[in-house]
Amino acid sequence: MDNRSVQRRRTGDVRHLLLAAAFLTCNSQLLLVDANSWWSLGLTPIQRPEMYIIGAQPLCSQLSGLSQGQRKLCQLYQDHMTYIGDGAKTGIKECQYQFRQRRWNCSTVDNTSVFGRVMQIGSRETAFTYAISAAGVVNAISRACREGELSTCGCSRTARPRDLPRDWLWGGCGDNVYYGKRFAQEFVDAREREKNYPRGSREHARTLMNLHNNEAGRQAVYNLADVACKCHGVSGSCSLKTCWLQLADFRRVGEFLKEKYDSAAAMRIGRKGRLELLDKRFNPPTPEDLVYIDLSPDYCHRNETTGSLGTQGRFCNKTSEGMDGCELMCCGRGYDQFRVYKHERCHCKFHWCCYVKCKRCSTLVDQFVCK
């Protein structure tokens, strides 16, 4: 199959998305405060209403945190919403894993903003959160296409890689990363594209920052997807292989974006209304890099204004010199030490046939908590 025919098929896959995007652009409005977020879809299960029940509310009217444009996309693609929620949940969990040993640990709060007021600051942490959330949606939608869960997409139609050996078959049902990336762009970016802040304003800079980091998250999933193959043959001889495009494990995506977080570029709004480097001595960021416009707040102490939850009560590692160490995690305030019993399986033995029997052991361990 030549590249032209592949491109035509891809274009057909996303034509409905482009039409929806044009519809949303014509109905944009000024949004001053993002008190709610679509991330909240990851905190509560999404259940499609039973249409035959008298008085049942439409699905999209039940979902909080959606912007006007996202709600319209919800109406057009209701079967996608469960997977958008799954993607948000995946992103939140990965964020919490990657930052589990940092002062800011991606904690959620009990409202539809999900992460609280700290997201109103255009910091490195905010940049990572936007990127990993967008990546989660690409991941979930791409896999749902492959599994036949969505009405507007199916298996990947990516062209055969040129470096694939000739005697290997190409055509297994792969993850549709192309569709997942396109749909995630239309849905996740809808909120930002509805805004109409004055060009060059601080609010406009924040919108550009969000859009850039959303794209960086999508690019991470797209670029890390790779070829997977399965052997066929008598007695596992692997005389034939069938290959397809497969998503990378999401942990790899999280680790990749964490590296981008550590090297994120500090930006400011320029005279032409575009983001530019704060320090021109550095190379400009690529679409895969994260960008931020504000310094991170003090995460050591609880602060209602910035949304920082502080590190009081956080566990720390007494012997570590890293960010999880008690000296850094507790910000010099000191720590309390106490002993607890840790219960775990031990002395496991295999019995024929066929089960494993273990004993339960208790060990007294020291734990340290920041004051």
UniProtKB/Swiss-Prot annotation:
GO terms for molecular function: cytokine activity; frizzled binding. One of its GO terms (biological process) is positive regulation of non-canonical Wnt signaling pathway. The gene is wnt5b. SMART domains: WNT1. Glycans are attached at residues 105, 111, 303, 317. It is found in: Secreted, Extracellular space, Extracellular matrix. InterPro entries: Wnt (IPR005817), Wnt_C (IPR043158), Wnt_CS (IPR018161). A lipid is attached at residue 235 (O-palmitoleoyl serine). Belongs to the Wnt family. One of its GO terms (cellular component) is extracellular space. Palmitoleoylation is required for efficient binding to frizzled receptors. Depalmitoleoylation leads to Wnt signaling pathway inhibition. Ligand for members of the frizzled family of seven transmembrane receptors. Probable developmental protein. May be a signaling molecule which affects the development of discrete regions of tissues. Is likely to signal over only few cell diameters. This is Protein Wnt-5b. Disulfide bonds join 95-106, 145-153, 155-173, 229-243, 231-238, 300-331, 316-326, 330-370, 346-361, 348-358, 353-354. Residues 1-28 form the signal peptide. Gene3D superfamilies: 3.30.2460.20. The keyword Transport does not apply. Its main location: secreted. It comes from Oryzias latipes. Keywords: Developmental protein, Disulfide bond, Extracellular matrix, Glycoprotein, Lipoprotein, Secreted, Signal, Wnt signaling pathway.
